[in-house]
């Protein structure tokens, strides 16, 4: 697969799990999986990323998305790297993980309302953190 295809696949995990851990107030992956509404939101975020990837010529199959949840379930109380950066007061890669995929999706004509909301929530959390 091309580098672009690999990046879209990586975003299928990074966007929801890094993002919801910050937007959820500093929660680990197991807490996301334990909350039906957060788990659903994670799936919707993955679907939005997949739609943009498909429009960009990089189809991602359902089984790949399913596998993201299966692997994450084995991680326990894992804290994604962006959450650790957020909690430690370090810079968070907001543009690379949430901003750029949103921008690319828009350019491709893909509606990504859940990602747009998450992007806003993360930026607000960073402002509040100071």
Task: Describe each model-derived feature in a short phrase.
Residues 4-29, 37-50, 77:
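Active-site-proximal catalytic alpha-helix in oxidoreductases
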